[in-house]
């Protein structure tokens, strides 16, 4: 039996940052994740993808962000159980929980924070005949190693941030990048849309809108695509076709825990602390939903911070926590290390 203050289900960026915030409150964390390594989608699906909206980082690769978070939480000595999925939860008479994994490992904690960790992401696939045949033969739903597309002809389909960001990134890798979207308007960040337009004007990206890919051709590998543009059909040659229409997460066994579910996400009380309808169980990051929800990493960091404050009250009933700033109090690691806050220097006015 693994005992901890907070059992975090999910080793993605939100779950990892929750360890840091909990550590500042002297709360011990253990992380459970179905994937074999920490990082969640960042490590599993796109470790080499640049991220542009992390405060203080004009650009950071997803994998590097994970490395930074792991370094940041090392001082708080979190436990990790990777490659196992949360299966069942049992509430105890004292209000604590026992969670059992699919491999029989048991965890005992007064607080559970669900931050993903389900290990199951289904890409939304376009309705194209025989597309399954070409999977791993030129059709890719994720980009883990951009170098695979070095000097290749790549067609990306989609209108969101992933399609825009990868088109921008691969413009300097592939020999030819074509972005296809069924509408003239994109739903990604305005800055990314403007960058794609700049690259189009510079001849580094071909933009085809409104259009859809309706067929794939090739004997053993993708050789060309059939597209429909303004009612007319034509063929474009390519080496890789990457449809980026988003991911559908699967809640798995957690969906049977009695939590309120809305559109495959866990409903939480965002006005307070991101707690679910079961006291002591929180949901943070992309796995939750509430009015005004934004699926952004930085929003997950905020949710993790408030969750830890509420968890402190559950774990230490009746004990008031006084907020301290790390710039004043420093950081005391569970491993005996201490990061000192800079001492204020006061000079007398002569």
Swiss-Prot record:
Xref: Pfam families: Pyr_redox_2
Keywords noted in UniProt: FAD, Flavoprotein, NADP, Oxidoreductase
InterPro entries hit by this protein: FAD/NAD-bd_sf, FAD/NAD-binding_dom, Fd--NADP_Rdtase_type_2, Ferredoxin-NADP_redctase_2
UniProt-annotated binding residues for FAD: 14, 33, 41, 46, 86, 121, 286, 327
Sample GO molecular function, one term: NADP binding
Required cofactor(s): FAD
Catalytic activity from the UniProt record: 2 reduced [2Fe-2S]-[ferredoxin] + NADP(+) + H(+) = 2 oxidized [2Fe-2S]-[ferredoxin] + NADPH
Record keyword NADP present: yes
Cofactor notes: Binds 1 FAD per subunit.
Enzyme class label: oxidoreductase
EC number from the UniProt entry: 1.18.1.2
Protein family membership: Belongs to the ferredoxin--NADP reductase type 2 family.
UniProt cross-references to PANTHER family, sorted A to Z: THIOREDOXIN REDUCTASE 1-RELATED-RELATED (PTHR48105)
Subunit structure: Homodimer.
Name by which UniProt lists this protein: Ferredoxin--NADP reductase
């Amino acid at each position: 039996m693994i005992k901890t203050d907070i059992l975090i289900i999910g080793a993605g960026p939100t779950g990892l940052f929750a360890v840091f915030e909990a550590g500042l409150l002297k709360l011990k964390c253990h992380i459970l994740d179905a994937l074999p390594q920490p990082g969640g989608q960042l490590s599993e699906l796109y470790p080499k993808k640049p991220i542009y909206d992390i405060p203080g980082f004009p650009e950071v690769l997803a994998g590097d962000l994970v490395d930074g978070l792991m370094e940041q939480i090392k001082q708080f000595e979190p436990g990790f159980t990777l490659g196992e999925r949360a299966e069942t939860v049992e509430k105890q008479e004292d209000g604590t929980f026992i969670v059992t994994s699919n491999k029989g490992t048991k965890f005992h904690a007064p607080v559970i924070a669900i931050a993903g960790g389900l290990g199951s992401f289904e890409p939304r696939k376009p309705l194209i005949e025989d597309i399954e045949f070409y999977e791993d033969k030129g059709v890719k739903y994720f980009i883990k190693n951009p170098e695979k597309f070095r000097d290749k002809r790549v067609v990306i389909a989609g209108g969101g941030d992933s399609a825009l960001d990868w088109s921008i990134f691969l413009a300097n890798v592939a020999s030819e990048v074509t972005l296809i979207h069924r509408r003239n308007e994109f739903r990604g960040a305005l800055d990314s849309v403007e960058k794609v337009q700049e690259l189009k004007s510079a001849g580094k990206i071909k933009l085809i809108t409104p259009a859809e890919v309706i067929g794939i051709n090739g004997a053993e590998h993708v050789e060309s695509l059939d597209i429909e543009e303004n009612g007319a059909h034509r063929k474009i040659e390519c080496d890789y076709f990457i449809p980026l229409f988003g991911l559908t997460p699967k809640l798995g066994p957690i969906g049977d825990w009695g939590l309120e579910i809305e559109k495959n996400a866990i409903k939480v009380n965002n006005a307070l602390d991101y707690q679910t309808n079961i006291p002591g169980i929180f949901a943070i990051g992309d796995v939750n939903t509430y009015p005004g929800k934004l699926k952004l990493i930085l929003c997950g960091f905020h949710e993790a911070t408030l969750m830890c404050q509420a968890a402190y009250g559950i774990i230490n009933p009746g004990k008031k926590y006084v907020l301290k700033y790390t710039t004043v109090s420093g950081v005391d690691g569970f491993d005996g290390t201490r990061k000192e806050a800079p001492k204020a220097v006061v000079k007398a006015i002569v």
